[in-house]
Amino acid sequence: MSSASRLQNVNIVSNNYSRYGTSVYDKLYHSNGSGSNNAGKNSTTVGKLSSISQKSRSKQRHGSNCSRSMSQSPLSTFKSPLSNQNQSSAPDDLASIGQRRSDDVTSLDNETIITMNSRKSRIKKKYKSLISTSSKKFMNKLYDHGASSDSFSIFSLKTSHSGKHENSRFEKLRKRKYHAWGKFADINDLPVEIIAKILSEFELGRDQKTLVRCLYVSKKFYKATKIVLYRLPYFTSTYRVAQFVTSLRLHPDNGAYVKVLDLSHLKPGIIGQDSKDSQGLDDDGHSRRHRRRRRRSTNTSLNLPPATPTSTISNEDDANSGLIKDDASNGSEVEDLALAGWRDWRYRNEPLYSSPLLNSFKLKKVVSRSSSITSTSSGNSTGVHSTRRQRSNSSVASITTSIMSSIYNTSHVSLSSTTSNTSNGNISSGSNLSRVSTAGSLKKASAKSTRSSPQKAKPISDITSSSWFRMRLSSRNRKARTANTINLKNSKDKSDDDFKVLKHDSGHPSNYRSSTLKFSIEQPFSTHHPYANKFLLKYAPYKDLPLGYILHMLNLCPNLVELNLSNLVICTDFKLINQRSERRRMTSSLLPAVQESSVSAGPEKDLEIVYMTDSGKGYEYYEGLSKKHSRSSSLGTNPSSWIGGQANWTDYPPPIDAQTKTREEHRRNNTLNNKNVVLKKLNPFEIFEMICNRNEEKGGYCSLTKVKMNDIVWCRQYMVKYFVMRTFRQHLDYKSMENNSYERHLFSFRDSGLDRNFSWACNAKLHEFVALMVMDHLSNLDDLGLEELFNIKSEKLYIKNYCCRDPDILEISNLFDIRYGAGSEADATSDSNLEAESLQFRLTILKTEKPTSFWLTKVSKDYVSLVVKLCVDDDIDMDKMKVGKPTLRIDSITHNLISRLKELRRVDLRRNVGENNYYAESII
């Protein structure tokens, strides 16, 4: 074999021949003794071959469809240069080499075509991108070196997605910045206070529903929303105030969010009356429109009838309609519909007051139905005695029917505003659960009975009380309850986003309309204000609150900034004091005592009873407990009472009756700790005392800077004096008078007290109230007290000291004490054990040509100096000057005080002149 036949095929993919070595290049394209011409031709041939190989490589990347063209193109290109070479002067050995080269390429091309058609080649095509070939290595190096610097190239880092680009410089910088900066913060990364500030915009926009829905977003939103909701609670109903107090007692942490407590907008519970006094609204026509709109919105949201009772009789009988009007006029004497108050919440666990069948709405409904049925029966009867008998029977029947309908979940609309259909004689109602016969059907039944027996008309009360009617009514109610239970079981798996619809199909004719029951998922807005119990309806015109509720709120809200108790009426309350008494041990045991574990009856029932209004028991109940305890203690200490004949049956523990559910409840209500209870009547003075004690515990820091108590009669003068003076004393002890920190406190007692002409019954700051208290104290002194305080009788003995005094000084008083506390006034309660405190002052009155002004100065630790610069210019009208009402009152009191002092000096001078004349006459 020749050397050319032993050469291997080399695929040249680049013009960089140094990669393959010069020996291979010389053996392929250079022969021994060849000239420069042949070398140049061979170089061009090799260049063509390299370009052809690159084109074939680029075509090979596109897919299997172009494989045949790629295999045929090198054959033609290889033949053309070699044939040209053979036509020119070329050696024979080179021609033979080219001929074999073309044969080899053709054979390789045929093998490639056969391989591509095979099944193995088709499998390889799927994994072709994963195979690392020489061409792929070349392209990767091309990306790394040539195109990475060109941002507009398709091989740049911005457009390529190769594996090596992940480790490029840009990716490293990006990862470095990510680790340095971390994750981008969102709204949940903000502090709770900042989120609460953002959510407070909903409160400013009066969007309360959106604010409440923010409670269900996330935990951080829940905390922030609670801060906004509890910051300024708004109450118009005493029932909601009672709920709020119980909620704070169950969750004391929420009380720290309350900043403003406003109880000045409470309204009475009566609705439906047109009298302005009972509603407590404005005198304009807007109050009546607001009341109607409120009643209409309440009835619409609750699916209730209007507040005024509607007629339940068809309009065919004009005589009956006239009787309805007369009965409606008589029914106006009955109290109207009323909303629940704090007493309804207090007795919510009592069976007599907690039943929904006995609320004022059911009472209104029963009255309207009884009047309508009475008018129908009276139209059919003739005698007076029969009318009276039918009236009573129909009332009893209507009450029984309404209560039975309420038990079976009958809608209120079907009970109070049902109508009759006389065209087809069928009963039509608002719900298929309602099984109450309307007046039209009853009238039709009575007409049939009249035609069958014309001698005597059967009264409607007999129809409703017949055994057939009761049997028919019970069967229909049983079917309705069965259908309701089946539909409720079938609808457990059906849930929507907003509500669930339950359709009750009871198999009745088509004229029966199926009702729809909707369950709303908006829990905060699904419960409406309840109605008052009919036994508590007499308290509906009042808007009072027990004193214990106010003390609870002040105790549970330590961060109050503003307190508004204007227009508030306080109800009498008592504090429960448990007295521990030693019980005589009859036996002794060496075994350790076993403590009985108590069973919890619920979070609300486990709350400690601090005040009497915290429980559902009345004053007589606790008085009876104290009497029982006193008798049992006397029986244990007096030996003569141990005889069985002197023991009373009430001394023994009562048996557990059917109303007591568990023995734990019986044990809780009959323990010795509860029996030994002493009731102490609460005084409104404790409101001010609690505020001052809380400030004392905080080291003189008073967060409560605004107190409003306007138009209240329970606020007495000694209460206001104690509150003002003790607050001022705390500023003297813990703070400096130079920074004027007391000027931040703003108090308002406008038109309060039993006398509205009090000097302190106004709006003023703390230092203004102190000045008013001092001047009011001096103005209330008698003549002897003023003479002693201002040295009127003794100043002539110290004439030298008074002559050298500054002429601008009108009066200077001695030191005097102002006593404040529960025992400092004559109108204070005698049972108060709080000792009266005192604070020393000195008054200095200066004259000036400018408007009156004053200031307080702490001269020493012993007393405080009050300086009043009194305007003596009569041309200046203080009423027209821009001064506050406290300054005007101080100016008026000071002028009166100066006039009294001048009159006392004139009287003393006249007395002294008379004495001198008498002494001179006696000498002569």
Curated annotation (Swiss-Prot):
Protein's name according to its UniProt entry: F-box protein COS111
Stretches assigned to the F-box domain: 185-236
Keyword Electron transport set for record: no
Natural source organism: Saccharomyces cerevisiae (strain ATCC 204508 / S288c) (Baker's yeast)
InterPro entries in the cross-refs: F-box-like_dom_sf (IPR036047)
Ranges of biased composition (kind: Basic and acidic residues): 274-286
Gene field: COS111
Composition bias, Low complexity: 369-385, 414-434
UniProt record, GO biological process: signal transduction
Domain of life: Eukaryota
Compositional bias ranges of the Polar residues kind: 63-90, 298-314
GO cellular component labels: mitochondrion
Region: Disordered, residue numbers: 35-103, 271-328, 369-396, 414-460
